[in-house]
Amino acid sequence: MASQPPEDTAESQASDELECKICYNRYNLKQRKPKVLECCHRVCAKCLYKIIDFGDSPQGVIVCPFCRFETCLPDDEVSSLPDDNNILVNLTCGGKGKKCLPENPTELLLTPKRLASLVSPSHTSSNCLVITIMEVQRESSPSLSSTPVVEFYRPASFDSVTTVSHNWTVWNCTSLLFQTSIRVLVWLLGLLYFSSLPLGIYLLVSKKVTLGVVFVSLVPSSLVILMVYGFCQCVCHEFLDCMAPPS
């Protein structure tokens, strides 16, 4: 007995895939669209409507006539179930198992319904879906330079921040200069004060009596002033203590 050629066998298998296994009618793009259940079995939409009309399934659920697996029916509409896109493409191409190239092969919309329809019910032993994603490098325009262009964003408030920072820097420099000048002046006055006695003696020896007397009397006069100031401060404290009312 001669075996059938592989081409005829493939065509017969393809034609079997295009038929509903309940009514054995050919799928079409109108009333008999191939619907995929959650158990990956295919049933035409017309048979699903009949199953719902017979009342064999609970409300909002369709029981698979092959494996009795319950599939939730979104919005209680058969049209909400995902279509088998492989069968639809085959029907669009003439139903002879030919592969049609999509209009845009580089783009594929992945949704739960689309992924469910991509799983072929005839291969129930495989529960794996392999998706290959390739990145196509676009050719750069010759008018564009190879040097990357970097744009800097300068907010409006950045100028005010810069001005405040500049003013703060100037203020710090001025304050530091003032403090340094005060320290130098204090050191010079201290050096002049402690060297006034030997300097006055030197001026007296040099016959400069007036300046010599001033410098010589600087240290004793300052000490007398400090003593008078301390005495007056003590007297004021005692006077305030006497004038204060008793507690």
UniProtKB/Swiss-Prot annotation:
Principal place of residence: membrane
SMART domains noted in UniProt: RING
Superkingdom classification of source: Eukaryota
CDD domains tied to this protein: RING-HC_RNF182
Gene Ontology molecular function: any one: ubiquitin-protein transferase activity
GO cellular component, one term: cytoplasm
Impact when changing residue 58 to L: In a colorectal cancer sample; somatic mutation
Recorded topology in the membrane: Multi-pass membrane protein
Pathway annotation: Protein modification; protein ubiquitination
Protein name (Swiss-Prot/TrEMBL): E3 ubiquitin-protein ligase RNF182
Organism: Homo sapiens (Human)
Gene name as annotated: RNF182
